[in-house]
Amino acid sequence: MGSSAKKKKEKKKDFQKTKLRVGKTKAKPENFTDTSFKAKSIVLNQQSLHISAPSADAQFTHHLSLTSSKSDTQRRDSLAHLTTSIVSRPVDSPLPQPVSAILPTLLPLILDASNGVRTQLLKLLRALPPADVQDHVAQLLPYIRAGMTHLAADLRVSAVEVLAWLVDVAGAEVVACAGGWIKTLNCFLSVLGWHTEESSKWSSSSSASVSASASATRASFGKAGAQGKPMIKMLGALAEFLQVGIGRPAEAAIGLDASDAEAGVAGWEFPLRHAAQHMVPRSSAPYIHLNLFGQPRDEEGEMYETREDRYRVFASRFLGAVQRGLEGARGEGGEVGRASAGVSKVLKEAIAYGPGP
């Protein structure tokens, strides 16, 4: 009985509130640890002075690997870190990683579903040195064309923005690489709604079909397409692309005047016309487009290195569809009409110049 009463008393003691007296300190618990002492140093088991912080190159490589993370926020933040590292590096200093190692990881993000990731990716691409990007145009274009023909309207607009940046930094390489001319033009006409069976059967008397095709094109851009902003970006990128591909060279008129003056000074007694046609060709294979002894080839995947070849293909395959589409866009007026005027200007100059001298 005594032991039982003692156990009950001890259990009851745990639930009793101790009465404190005035001026008397509270009793310290049994697991109390005295921290009133002062130490000159604190030693941790895992602390070591020999472990150094990761270098900037190591952090760059780490964030580059995080661009394939499943989290949209992680991918966006990693791209922001990469952009800051490239922009803030000293002038004329090399990149933490070569562009040949950076681009293969970044290219799939052109088709990323997150709008924030694609926006940050474009900022990163603009921070890359243009001279280093020119050698990798052939790797970029397939992803850009896939984005231009994507089902998502926002993704199509982002792909066109990437293409506009690429044409700005490496325009000559874009239009001259394999598939860079015909395939990209097909993507443009597909996105704009100009490359359709109705447009090929269009006649001057069917103005209703033009307005119908314009409304269908506008609807393909989603809610933002009602304001025409995606259409303006598309037309602006198309104007830049055509200017690089078939635009009249700035030195063309100056070169012809200079050649005529030199001929007159040399003492030619007869009028000389089209002198450039009798000179040594500038291209290594001027008659390669005839394909006299070659096997049947894929025109869409070919390289059109000269303006003459690009204009010949454009005039035979795309000129009619582009002119009909521009007429419909010009009829809409507003900002879309002004944007189409830029494309029309480039097209008129190219037609006036023709295949070349």
From Swiss-Prot:
It holds the Pfam family Ipi1_N. It comes from Aspergillus clavatus (strain ATCC 1007 / CBS 513.65 / DSM 816 / NCTC 3887 / NRRL 1 / QM 1276 / 107). Keywords: Nucleus, Ribosome biogenesis, rRNA processing. Belongs to the IPI1/TEX10 family. Component of the RIX1 complex, composed of ipi1, rix1/ipi2 and ipi3 in a 1:2:2 stoichiometry. The complex interacts (via rix1) with mdn1 (via its hexameric AAA ATPase ring) and the pre-60S ribosome particles. Transmembrane segments: none annotated. GO terms for biological process: rRNA processing. Component of the RIX1 complex required for processing of ITS2 sequences from 35S pre-rRNA. Its main location: nucleus. Gene3D superfamilies: Leucine-rich Repeat Variant. Residues 1-27 are annotated as: Disordered. GO terms for cellular component: nucleus; rixosome complex. This is Pre-rRNA-processing protein ipi1. Residues 1-11 have a biased composition (Basic residues). It is found in: Nucleus. The lineage of its organism: Eukaryota, Fungi, Dikarya, Ascomycota, Pezizomycotina. It comes from the Eukaryota.
